[in-house]
Amino acid sequence: MDEVIVEYIRRTVLKIPRDEIMAVLQKWGFLSEAQLQTINFRQTKEGISHSVAQLCEESSADLKQAALLDIIYNHIYPNKRVWSVYHMNKTGEETDFFDFRDFKKKFRRQIQSALINVTINFREYEDNAIWIRIAWGTPYTKPNQYKTSYVVYHSQTPYVFISASVLRSNLPLLCQAMVVASNYHDIHEMELRSHCLNSLKDIVFKRYSQNFQTNYPLQERNVLTENVDLRINDENRSEKERIYRLNQESFGNGPQPKLDFAQYKLETMFKSDPKWDVLEKKEPFRCLVKFSSPHLLESLKSLAPAGLADAPLSPLLTCIPQKARNYFKIREKKSLHPGSFVSP
């Protein structure tokens, strides 16, 4: 058995939380229950990883089994990677019958026609999600199993979730393989990325609580009324109700999808009175603003009720789930009056 494969399996085990190693290995299914019972799971992770590697060596684990363990690990812990959302388009509205075996054949053939040194592994899950693991090599080197790309594709949908490897030069080939295998016409990257794969799915599949104009739900209204200090005057009470209503209209009344950042790029021209001659060159002013939080949308939702921001928040902040993007480019609208200016 290849020592490189044994070491890869050992390192994969090291990434798993110690209390969950047993459960992950059981899902893997390569080692029997009798073999797993011989492992002392109370020892250090280093010791556990060596025990697992030894059993795998005795059982002649191959690259396919090592790749399967890696897929299972990434499926259980998808937040360890950064995922980007891609959208595919068809030329017509017809819906093709999806054949998993045909999909795998086309995908593999498309990539291997351009690059021989590549390993591709598939795993289908109950929610119609196909997980694809690609380890890339070069025309002269073997595939690097530590620099993999991952693709998650739900059949019969136009959305693809890709976590690219550091070898981004292979990304166009990967996208082309997805288009060919799934019988679409083209593919483009959406401006939506996050560590939380499930939240990205919630956004593009519209599975989150969407904003809508409404009065207070009865239960929420009663809770608010019960918690109001009777000494608070009507003006403050009305303001709290206004903030609550606007917040509900902006974010809905359910939990928000989990995103960890939103990025805004501003590009505008510096405007001044022409006679001041402030700028010799008419270069645009560029600015990058990035909001980061373990749960950005919930953090934004809590700003107005906490008195840290005015309600309603800017649409640039509240439109993230509806527009399915957390990367924005803000450019100024062309002025109808070229001579107008804004003083600095």
Curated annotation (Swiss-Prot):
PANTHER family: CENTROMERE PROTEIN N. Pfam families: CENP-N. It comes from the Eukaryota. It is found in: Nucleus; Chromosome, Centromere. GO terms for cellular component: chromosome, centromeric region; nucleoplasm. It comes from Gallus gallus. This is Centromere protein N. Belongs to the CENP-N/CHL4 family. Probable component of a centromeric complex involved in assembly of kinetochore proteins, mitotic progression and chromosome segregation. Keywords: Centromere, Chromosome, Nucleus. GO terms for biological process: CENP-A containing chromatin assembly; chromosome segregation.
